[in-house]
Amino acid sequence: MRKIKDIEKGLLTDCRQIQSPHFDKRPNPQDISLLVIHYISLPPEQFGGGYVDDFFQGKLDPKIHPYFAEIYQMRVSAHCLIERNGRITQYVNFNDRAWHAGVSNFQGREKCNDFAIGIELEGSNEQPFTDAQYFSLQELTNVIMKSYPKITKDRIVGHCDISPKRKIDPGQYFDWERYLSSVK
């Protein structure tokens, strides 16, 4: 695994970049103060194939899989995806608002997309995440916290924490203790 070096003007300096059209400007970019951990797999329970890239770019082909026909018109994105092998792709500049949290609330404040960074792990609620993913997530988190100091350990949450009636990610197999033990 290679170490993540830095963030410059909201972009990781040394990772794969694919621009998603599914974002807009934050109301206040200086207010970035929450990190939200998600999981995604397309099709469900399947990994690889590049379908998350297609989905976040609005290019998912509904004919490829029955599930895609249900979701291909959704306009969603995350700031980054960490694949099973640990590779990180950034889709949205951290200073912009990705559309990952939906209806959400953190400590009484709604619209978490306004002040949150969203990280997707390629995974599901049916199996553990990989060592490579934990390594990359820990490295990425430390670089994000250095660049956005309002994000502290107590402001790192799962999607399930900000949308508890709608979402379960990052799920039962996400090892919060392992992850947070290496976050500085």
Swiss-Prot record:
The record ties this protein, via InterPro entries, to: Amidase/PGRP_sf (IPR036505), Amidase_domain (IPR002502), NAMLAA_amidase_2 (IPR051206)
* Key words of the record: Cell wall biogenesis/degradation, Cytoplasm, Hydrolase, Metal-binding, Zinc
Q: Which cofactor does it need?
A: Zn(2+)
- Note whether Hydrolase occurs among the keywords: yes
User: For this protein, what is the EC number?
Assistant: 3.5.1.28
- Which Pfam families has this protein been placed in? Amidase_2
Give the active-site positions: 120 (proton acceptor)
The entry's cellular-component GO terms read: cytoplasm
Keyword Cytoplasm applies: yes
Q: Where does Zn(2+) bind?
A: 38, 159, 169
**Sites annotated Transition state stabilizer:** 167
CDD domains listed in its UniProt record:
PGRP (cd06583)
**Start and end residues of each N-acetylmuramoyl-L-alanine amidase domain:** 30-171
- What family is this? Belongs to the N-acetylmuramoyl-L-alanine amidase 2 family.
Cited function: Involved in cell wall peptidoglycan recycling. Specifically cleaves the amide bond between the lactyl group of N-acetylmuramic acid and the alpha-amino group of the L-alanine in degradation products containing an anhydro N-acetylmuramyl moiety.
What is the protein name given in its UniProt record?
1,6-anhydro-N-acetylmuramyl-L-alanine amidase AmpD
